Amino acid sequence: MIDFNQFPSPCYIMEEELLRKNLCLIKNVADRAGVEIILAFKSFAMWRSFPIFREYIDHSTASSVYEARLALEEFGSKAHTYSPAYTEQDFPEIMRCSSHITFNSMQQFERFYPMVVAEGSGISCGIRVNPEYSEVETELYNPCAPGTRFGITADLLPDVLPQGIEGFHCHCHCESSSYELERTLEHLEAKFSRWFPQIKWLNLGGGHLMTRKDYDTEHLITLLQGLKARHPHLRIILEPGSAFIWQTGVLTSEVVDIVESRGIKTAILNVSFTCHMPDCLEMPYQPAVRGAEMGNEGKYIYRLGGNSCLSGDYMGLWSFDHPLQIGERIVFEDMIHYTMVKTNMFNGIHHPAIAIWTKEGKAEIYKQFSYEDYRGRMS
């Protein structure tokens, strides 16, 4: 049990034991299925925890030059890099930090592949393909929506791939099940398997939430084993993000005031949904609050409000078993993925600290933010 008194407030706190539990499961899937599973930095990049990850996995995936550099310098291995578009300015550094580079279009491949050849370090290049199939319901997160900017459809690929394309990358999941992957593979193979003899690797992207309690990992392993049996020469790669740190930590906050308007009580916190939990408003993703239930049934009902000037910076209603008090701790569950990587300093609101609760039961504070962090971003 975390001793919250050892941490500043607000604070993102990851539990090492829960992280290791997820890492063990993911390594078991990879070993049994004969595939490689790598960490996607877009969901989680708390680099001080990378030594723990390196006990279980070898590589990571990047979507930008900064993520690629983080992979090389902090994770300790070159990145599998994909970006919707590379620039002349960034590409030399992308090459320095990457073992694999996936291009989003043939134009980008034709523009930058000569630089890869000239660089001469053996970078493996691929192209992102669009199977035109995804079961992601939230349009904001659907990479295969009509008119998407991501990937090449089968009708636009030449019969013979250009020299230098060694892999396909396909990403069309978001917190998905193995059964969604099964249906995706049917579409992917129907549209693109005729090119499989020409490539060396197939990256199935992220969104495979294999650490969720109801996820059928045995079915996933069987699926991947079957895919490898059908295409034994292909190296299969998965790059989930959330799965690695699913349910591994919290965001702690405190009540700083309680206001009431038209019968609605709002507990104003020292955190912000728009600044520190943006998916709650964008997705929208419904967070869980420790010791509270969603809904307006009960004696002590509160809306939870963020401490910014955005009118919509609130969530709720929540039912508590007692009246909230100023200074009381409010704990948001499962707030390690897609939070720290997406936070901002809107309004100059104090940014939560970043910390870990070690398996030995000790608090390690990785980062505390200050006025200088805010000032340094502004100019």
Task: Name every feature range the model reports, one short phrase each.
Residues 35-201, 215, 223-226:
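Active-site-proximal beta-alpha core segment in soluble small-molecule metabolic enzymes
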Residues 238-379:
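Charged (often Lys/Glu-rich) extended helix/loop segments that serve as interaction or gating elements
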Residues 190, 195-199, 219-226, 230-231, ...:
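Acidic/histidine-enriched ion/cofactor-binding microenvironments in catalytic or ligand-binding pockets
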Residues 178-183, 211-220, 247-253, 257, ...:
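Short glycine/threonine-rich loop-to-helix capping motif typified by GTGT followed
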Residues 133-135, 174, 210, 244, ...:
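Feature marks short, surface-exposed loop/turn motifs that line or immediately flank catalytic pockets
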Residues 1-76, 272, 320-333, 337-339:
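N-terminal capping/small domains of soluble enzymes
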Residues 171-173, 202-211, 240-242:
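Glycine-rich beta-strand-to-loop/alpha-helix junction loops that act as flexible
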